[in-house]
Each structure stands twice: as structure tokens, then as C-alpha cells.
């Protein structure tokens, strides 16, 4: 990545740039529209395998607008359509090109399927080698992960992109949680804590003036909630994933499913806060801050009502060795990472 203080030092932005949040559950691309506003395109990073025994069904699905590709006599339904089909038909297994924040080594078609979806989201570019910053996780502290290898796989996917005019992109990685600080903490001189609660990982960063002081990830986030809550109530993770979008963490649970989801949310947040406390303990000799430190949360798993309040409770109980200021959940928190990637690209040297 380029100089991480670039956003502070270079107020003029690059005219053409792209930001890409390549997450375990969501793929999001951010560009500027003609008016200079942020414009987003999103797809779910998932697919279904459908044997092509009945060509009529395949053709009907295609006519209905289901994104489909065909390979080796197998049809693949992509994105949101795949999730909806898996939810309505329990016999279908939803497959994921990424798991725990990284490319899924068990899915042999992950590279090709992700390439198709990401290239489609990028759409057309206006010049050759258009600068594109894409999100990568930090290495996990609770499982063995290889963020560098994952970043190279994503780089290869992006370098294989070609527009209709033959234009390419120039991909560069940026830490996912640092991108949130670029997106949401300009008013605090890019100083604060950020946590991206995605599908596969929680990514955390503490930065001062745009420079990361510590960062880490935890392989226990949205998918983990789905898996553990499903196990507790005897449902499928796909069912829990749908129910999770309806949960309100400010209200007492009234069903077994709600109780399981709320319990797993609290466990995930408590674990994250414990590791943040350790992060500050490890660097406290090298930093000195008496000011309040704002905390930004983003990502789809942070979307439920009451998430911010539950995080605040856990932070108070943990007695973090810094003065926590505002807990900020942006209105468009699902898009914060992609927005930060775009801002980094626009201000790169």
C-alpha cells in the first residue's frame, strides 16, 4: 500500500479510481458517479451447484434473471439468487468461494466464480490500469491463516479483469479495518479504533493519524454466529442467517432462535473486546493518548439494531485502558470498507 498518511497530506483526489471490499459474504465495489457521489454495486459471495439433468429448468431460471454460468455439465447459480434458493429448498447446499475471510481451499471453482462476480461488479473502466484498492484481512490470532497468500489470489483475480475496450485495473491491497478509518474518521484526523464485523472475520485496527498502531483479525464472526446458533436450535446455518437479519439486540429474546442468535452475538463482541484490550496493553509503552478515542463499527454482522449498545456495554465491562469516545455505526455501515478503499485509491501517490 502507498503512504498511509496520504489522506491527510493530499486533499486533491485522483479523478478515476475504484474501491473493492472483497468479503467472505459480500462483494462490494465503490466508484464515483458523474456528480462525484459514492456509487456502490453489491453481490453475495456465494453459489449453488445445479446438475444440468433438466435443460428446461436451466433455461427457465435463466429467463427469470437468475445469474447462471455453465461448466462441465453443471450450472452454477450466483449471488443473492443462490442464497434465496438455498433458503427455500433445504436440499440445496449453499457454497462459499471464501471462508473465514480467505479464499476457500475446498472449493475448486472458487477462483473462477469469484472472478466472474468481481469482474461484473467492476463493470466498465474509463482508462487502462485504473487504480483499484481492495480490502485484505490481517492474519487471524485464533486460527492459522495466510493473509498474504489470500491477497495474492485476489490480486490475480483483479489483474485478469479486462473491460470491453481491453482496459485493465492496477490492484493494490489495503487492510480492511484501516479502510474503515479512512472512510469514517476524517473528522478525527484518521485516529481511532475500527472493527469490521464481516461474514468470516472480525477485522480490527487502531490507527493514529492514518498510521496503524496495531491490527488483527478473529475468525469468529457472522458465519460463526450462524453455525453455532444453528447447532443450538437444530436449524440450518442458512436459516439462521436469514433470521439474523431480523434480530433486534435491544429487545429480550422471545424464541429459542432469537435467544441463540443474541447469545452468540454477545460472545463474539466480548471476544473482540478482550483482544482489543490486549492490543492496547501490548503497545501502551509506545503511545500516549489522553484524548477520547472514537470506535467505528462496520460490516453486515454489525447491522442489527442494538449492536452499538451491546458493544458499549462490553467495552465498559472490559475496562479498556483508553478513554473510549463515541461508538459510531455509519448509516451505510455495509459499504464503509469499499468507501475507504476508494478514498485510499483516490489519494494514493
Model feature map: region roles:
Residues 1-68, 73-194, 209-218, 222, ...:
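Nucleotide/phosphate-binding catalytic cleft detector across ATP-hydrolyzing
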Residues 203-205:
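A structural feature that tracks compact, well-ordered secondary-structure segments
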Residues 23, 198-201:
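Short flexible coil/turn linkers enriched for glycine and charged/polar residues
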Amino acid at each position: 500500500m502507498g503512504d498511509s498518511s496520504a489522506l491527510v497530506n493530499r486533499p486533491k483526489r485522483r479523478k478515476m479510481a475504484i474501491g473493492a471490499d472483497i468479503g467472505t459474504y459480500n462483494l462490494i465495489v465503490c466508484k464515483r458517479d458523474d456528480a462525484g457521489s459514492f456509487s456502490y454495486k453489491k453481490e453475495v459471495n456465494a453459489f449453488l451447484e445445479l446438475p444440468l439433468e433438466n435443460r428446461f429448468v436451466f433455461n427457465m431460471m435463466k429467463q427469470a434473471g437468475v445469474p447462471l454460468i455453465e461448466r462441465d455439465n453443471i450450472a452454477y447459480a450466483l449471488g443473492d439468487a443462490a442464497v434465496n434458493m438455498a433458503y427455500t429448498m433445504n436440499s440445496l447446499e449453499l457454497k462459499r468461494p471464501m471462508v473465514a475471510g480467505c479464499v476457500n481451499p475446498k472449493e475448486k471453482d472458487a477462483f473462477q466464480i469469484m472472478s466472474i462476480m468481481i469482474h461484473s461488479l467492476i463493470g466498465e473502466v474509463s482508462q487502462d490500469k485504473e487504480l483499484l484498492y481492495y480490502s485484505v484481512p490481517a492474519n487471524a490470532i485464533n486460527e492459522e491463516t495466510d493473509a498474504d497468500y489470500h491477497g495474492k489470489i485476489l490480486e490475480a483475480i483483479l489483474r485478469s479483469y479486462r473491460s470491453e475496450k481491453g482496459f485493465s485495473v492496477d490492484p493494490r491491497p489495503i487492510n480492511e479495518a484501516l479502510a474503515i478509518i479512512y472512510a469514517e474518521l476524517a473528522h478525527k484526523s484518521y485516529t481511532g479504533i475500527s472493527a469490521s464485523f464481516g461474514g468470516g472475520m472480525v477485522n480490527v485496527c487502531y490507527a493514529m493519524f492514518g498510521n496503524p498502531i496495531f491490527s488483527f483479525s478473529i475468525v469468529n464472526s457472522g458465519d460463526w454466529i450462524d453455525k453455532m446458533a444453528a447447532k443450538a436450535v437444530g436449524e440450518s446455518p442458512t436459516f439462521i442467517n436469514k433470521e439474523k437479519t431480523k434480530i433486534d439486540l435491544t429487545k429480550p429474546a422471545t424464541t429459542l432462535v432469537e435467544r441463540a442468535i443474541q447469545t452468540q452475538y454477545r460472545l463474539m463482541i466480548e471476544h473482540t473486546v478482550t483482544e482489543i484490550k490486549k492490543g492496547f496493553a501490548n503497545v501502551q509503552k509506545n503511545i500516549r493518548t489522553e484524548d477520547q478515542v472514537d470506535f467505528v463499527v462496520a460490516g453486515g454482522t454489525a447491522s442489527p439494531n442494538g449492536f452499538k449498545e451491546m458493544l458499549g456495554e462490553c467495552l465498559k465491562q472490559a475496562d479498556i485502558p483508553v478513554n473510549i469516545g463515541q461508538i459510531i455505526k455509519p448509516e451505510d455501515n455495509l459499504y464503509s470498507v469499499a468507501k475507504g478503499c476508494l478514498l485510499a485509491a483516490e489519494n494514493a501517490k
